[in-house]
Regions:
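ATP-binding N-terminal substructure of ATP-dependent carboxylate-amine bond-forming enzymes
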Residues: 1-106, 138, 320
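CheY-like receiver
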Residues: 66-70, 142-143, 176-179
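Short acidic active-site motifs
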Residues: 62, 139-143, 172
Length: 344
């Protein structure tokens, strides 16, 4: 590994650590971003061999020119990554156009859509909720006749709980269909009565897990967003064997290589006629990037490690170079809302 392009090295702010650790491994880290160089944190500046500023990172022509410049000046580019959901598709397109190793559009496209994920979950032997792609009211009613209320409707290609609806009645269903979503394709799924757990891992070039951990979100992100509730989740001290096994099978089915991933699952809170017995692991969503926000830092505290270095070691050496500590802990995040008055 010699030359590596990191897209948006300045944002999110903690992602500078990926660049710093790559630099410490002797890699030429080449940054592309929309912030002026002088505004970059001094630690980011110190980690970058060179920085190419574009006016608009969504302008593919500008991004293409930036990568072309680095190719001309430094030669073969060995890797390109943002580790950011928003840029995944653009990253893949740039890799294809410049023959850079890593995830390409033909592999990413079916994985990015909620409906496309279902095929891979089936290959992995992990159950998933029944679904249909929303067209008109009659088709939705026919689907609900089969699975019953409530159902969940959300964009087929989306992230988090943006535009996610829990529909409990025909009246709410009609109200949903009356909305204009600007041509966005929605997927409708049966409601899964489960608690959300994640399988977070750094995966090597042969699909081998180099680091495995996970979190528990007792209150779903959908409920937090739609009901304006407080957010809390925690990193598990030790993930359960069945979750680990489901995560590994999904890594194999999705063909994940050389990535930091965040796979979400339900654990059923009650028996379900279609999905299985109470406690069964059910698939929710596959994210081909680290868990959002400062979760990587939480993983560090919980696992006595440095996932930024672990990722950089995977990229550079295809292994973890530091053994870390055997000590494991829980790490809890609690988010409070400005609009609420908290007494205790």
């Amino acid at each position: 590994m010699k030359n590596f392009i990191f897209v948006s090295p300045h944002f999110p702010v903690n992602y500078r650590n990926f660049c710093i650790k790559l630099h410490e491994n002797g890699v030429n880290v080449l940054g592309i971003g929309d912030a002026p160089y002088d505004s970059l944190d001094y630690m980011v500046q110190g980690a970058l061999t060179e920085y190419y500023r574009v006016n608009n990172m969504e302008n593919y022509d500008e991004m293409y020119r930036a990568v072309a410049f680095f190719c001309f000046k430094y030669g073969k580019i060995d890797g390109l990554e943002s580790n950011n959901e928003y840029w995944l598709e653009q990253d893949a397109r740039l890799r294809l156009d410049f023959n850079i190793p890593g995830l390409k559009p033909e592999t990413l496209t079916p994985i990015k859509s909620k409906s496309g994920m279902k095929k891979f979950y089936a290959q992995a032997g992990v159950p998933s909720a029944r679904y249909h792609l929303v067209t008109d009211l009659a088709q939705s009613l026919a689907f609900i006749e089969k699975v019953g209320y409530p159902v969940i409707a959300k964009p087929n290609n989306g992230v988090g709980a943006v535009d996610t609806f829990k529909i409990n009645s025909d009246e709410e269903l009609r109200a949903f269909h009356d909305q204009d979503f600007g041509g966005v394709q929605f997927i409708m799924e049966e409601f899964v009565p489960g608690e959300i757990f994640s399988y977070d891992a750094i995966i090597g070039s042969n699909g081998q897990p180099l680091l495995e951990t996970g979190n528990n979100t007792p209150r779903s992100i959908m409920e937090i967003v739609n009901n304006q509730e407080s957010c809390f989740f925690y990193i598990e001290k030790q993930i359960k064997d069945d979750l680990r096994e489901a995560g590994r099978r999904c890594v194999d089915a999705f063909g994940i290589r050389s990535r930091f991933i965040h796979f979400e699952f339900f654990r059923l809170l009650e028996d379900h006629a279609y999905l299985g017995k109470k406690g069964t692991i059910v698939s929710l969503e596959a994210n081909l990037r680290p868990s959002g926000g400062f979760t990587p830092d939480m993983i560090n505290y919980a696992n006595s490690t440095d996932v930024y270095k672990d990722w950089a070691d995977m990229i550079t050496f295809d292994r973890l170079c530091s053994k870390g500590s055997a000590e494991k802990f829980y790490c809890v995040s609690v988010g409070l809302r400005d609009s609420r008055h908290y007494v205790h």
